Amino acid sequence: MEQLFTVWGETLDKEHVLDEYPRPLMVRDSYLNLNGYWDYAFTQEFVCPKEFDGKILVPFSPEAALSGVNRQLMPDEYLWYHRTFSVDGHKTKRADESFSEEDPESGMGADLTEERLLLHFGAVDQACVVWVNGQRIGKHTGGYLPFEFEITEAVQAGENDLVVAVKDLSDTSYHSRGKQKLERGGMFYTAQSGICQTVWLERVPEKYIKEVETLPEPDEEKVRIIVRSGAEYAVKIVLQKPKIHKELKKNVPDDPVEDMTGSRIADPVESTTETTIGTFYGKTNEWLEIPVQDVQMWTCDTPYLYDFTVEMEKDRVAGYFAMRKFTLEKDGQGFVRICLNHQVQYQNGVLDQGYWPDGLYTAPSDEAMIFDLEQMKKCGFNMVRKHLKIEPQRWYYHCDRLGLVVWQDMVNGGGKYKHWFVTYAATLMSWWKIRMRDIYSGLLARKEKEGRLEFVKEMKETVHRLKGHPSIAAWVIFNEGWGQFQTEDMTAILRKEDPDRLIDQASGWFDQGGGDFCSLHNYFFKLKIHPEKERASVLSEFGGYSYRIEGHSACGKLYGYGICRGKKALNRRYRKRMEQVKNLIDEGLCASVYTQWSDIEEEVNGVYTYDRKIRKID
């Protein structure tokens, strides 16, 4: 496979790697980025090596070119990470204040008698154990979700040792894996492992805000907010007037990565009488209702966000929400339609799998993520289906502020897939409208009880972590039967976790008749739909036309759903298929998702090439 690089990978500043504030929904003034060079080693035994193999650039996986390692972690191996950090004399700043070296209150000070220190991992694939100064802090399983540990008692003044051990079974286990495969090819791609999102430290008061959840209710002109903490405390919430976060601001001091702090990449929250809606008081762990008059609704053209700050004891965080509502409603012809703020919205989407040739699961920079999302809108898409992957929170923040609707897939897992069944046979069954119950765990690769329980746990946590993002309109539970089980039960669980959003319970085939969508995949046949009385008709995958460009393709072999010999041929087929989609709108079609945004390895059916340097579809 030929190694390709994006322009962001080619110009990567290795002293400032993905240093933007990683949690835009809840911004705190204390932030120490631990991205950068770490020691690494591969071992056969679960024993920390005395000597390491070299340096790895975190948060890029060892399989990614930007990591500097270029080596696959195998299921019978362990990957070890090591670095040091200091909690003395580090400068910090509030997310909405200017930087000041003279501030005596700033810094990751070693005196933590009245403060706590939290260690955050954006994602580590697949299972890991963490030590600080030789003390085991905790472990985590699941390669797609963030987690954190309190490390206060393990930290000492001066230099501290941080060690992470990783095990990744990839597609040889039932754990969530997405499109990763040790033997890549076709629609499955290079397996990656280890730390793949930002690692960071956060200093918090002893009594601190653990979580802020918002529930906007635009029809009632109010928002409900709950501030969660370990006990009951008084809280103060200052709500700002809505605005659109068009311009990003980055105020980072000229310090090396290990000494720097960052702020949320957005306009700072200002508290003046001209910009403030009001100040509201309540208690932690109780819902507080706040009236919002003259509501500015979030839309794709006007993505208004409401900034706010929360104060509790000595703690203070900043966040945002949006006033918007996704519903199913019937139009004048009786067709069920997807509506945004009670207005019919045809969701013209594109499938995005979040792979990069130089970073694999990790975008080379924040600017690279922004490029993809801005170009999607310029290409006429108002929706993106995030396929079998969970992105860093900043990706969803950019969708929020740019006005790009998101369908979020749950990440698939399970045993070894029977592709003859879930691909070829299922395609024909879908065309002939043969409905199969999801009770055949062997055919659908869900025999392990542990795997089923883990899927439910991760589905709930995915919703919990992401439901604050207004851009997310729909959850997709299962894709093409991969690891599918108890679909109606999963739909009920998900509906209870988040009644605010729409649900695609089975994208492609093995539809059990529930959820909000009749969700079809069609790559080979004439496009047609069969509108239903209660569910919206969506074409959740189609297209996939392949066109390989020499010098911008990673593989000589190509994969797709119709080979085109040139750009003109590709665009002719694309326009013809899109015209067929357009004609179905009057027959009840509510949304469509073109496959796909960019080429990935052998699968050269992207709007863009894998390196994002050439747009193939005009």
Give the role of each language-model region:
Residues 1-31:
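N-terminal pre-domain segments of enzymes
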Residues 2, 9, 39-43, 71, ...:
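Accessory beta-strand-rich segments of carbohydrate-active enzymes
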Residues 35-58:
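Predominantly extracellular/luminal regions of secreted and cell-surface proteins
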Residues 65-86, 115-121, 126-132, 138, ...:
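Active-site-adjacent substrate/metal-binding segments within catalytic domains
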Residues 113-116, 218-226:
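Short coil/turn motif common to extracellular beta-sandwich-like domains
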Residues 121, 223-230, 342:
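Aromatic/hydrophobic beta-strand junction motif of beta-rich domains
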Residues 153-159, 228-255, 265-331:
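Extended acidic/polar, glycine-enriched regions
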Residues 383-616:
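Substrate-binding/catalytic cleft of secreted carbohydrate-active enzymes
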